[in-house]
């Protein structure tokens, strides 16, 4: 068994500042064909002084390949993507901290891969997001 770690990228960068009331989508990630377990660590770091409502929602847009038959990967649509986490950067919330980090198990469920969608619910500040996938690959010894 090996442990493979991969940084999720956003237009080839390892982090993305998501503007107030904005949404950003990561580059596509492809699972290793031998992956049998996976988790994703999410990070949200407020670009200013956090206030009430400074939240980031993370949704996962899985792909199982080319459902449309047009030769490209087809991902879950944005409004139907699964909510995997909400991180609150305001310390007075419970939970709430800046930066905020959370690790979430990913059901590999034979998915080919995914994209990550980060939606900033703040009306006043940008929030920088990062994500890292850890896969367990190969036989258990």
Where are these regions (language model features)?
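Solvent-exposed, flexible loop/coil segments flanking beta-strands in beta-rich domains
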Residues: 1-43
């Amino acid at each position: 068994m090996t442990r493979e770690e991969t940084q999720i990228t956003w237009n080839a960068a390892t982090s993305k500042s998501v503007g107030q009331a904005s949404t950003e989508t990561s580059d596509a990630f492809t699972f290793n064909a031998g992956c049998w377990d996976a988790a994703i660590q999410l990070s949200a770091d407020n670009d200013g002084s956090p206030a009430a409502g400074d939240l980031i929602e993370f949704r996962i847009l899985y792909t199982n390949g080319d459902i449309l038959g047009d030769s490209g990967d087809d991902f879950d649509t944005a409004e139907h993507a699964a909510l995997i986490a909400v991180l609150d950067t305001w310390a007075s919330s419970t939970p709430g901290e800046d930066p905020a980090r959370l690790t979430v198990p990913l059901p590999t469920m034979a998915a080919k891969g995914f994209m990550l969608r980060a939606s900033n619910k703040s009306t006043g500040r940008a929030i920088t997001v990062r994500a890292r996938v850890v896969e367990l690959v190969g036989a258990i010894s």
